């Protein structure tokens, strides 16, 4: 079964205390080119500069409610950063598995959020 509007609303409510609202910006040039209103959600203003924090928080909050105290994931960057940041916020253990060679910038941000790689 896929996502439902009720499930999406529940997830939004669950993560609300942990995320900031991001701006919705009209893409004027793209709108003119396509002859339609095009709007872009700017997720680069989040703590991890990606929407990935939203999914990580939603999943980890649900896991915490079931007693999970440590999680692991495999990621080349943005998802790992989201999980690391969520782990820091929720005070649960996180292990991030990244392929070699590791992107130095993404690894540094992940380590900054206290997640071992």
Residue ranges and their predicted role:
Residues 1-117:
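PLP-dependent amino-acid enzyme catalytic core
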């Amino acid at each position: 079964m896929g996502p439902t509007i009720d499930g999406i609303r529940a997830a939004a409510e669950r993560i609300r205390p942990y995320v900031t609202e991001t701006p919705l910006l009209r893409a004027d040039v793209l709108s003119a080119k396509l002859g339609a209103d095009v709007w872009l959600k700017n997720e680069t203003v989040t703590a991890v500069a990606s929407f990935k924090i939203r999914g990580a928080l939603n999943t980890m909050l649900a896991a915490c409610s079931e007693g999970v105290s440590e999680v692991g994931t495999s990621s080349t960057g943005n998802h790992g950063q989201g999980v690391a940041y969520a782990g820091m916020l929720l005070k649960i253990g996180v292990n991030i598995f990244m392929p070699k060679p590791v992107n130095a910038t993404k690894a540094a941000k992940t380590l900054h959020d206290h997640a071992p790689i």
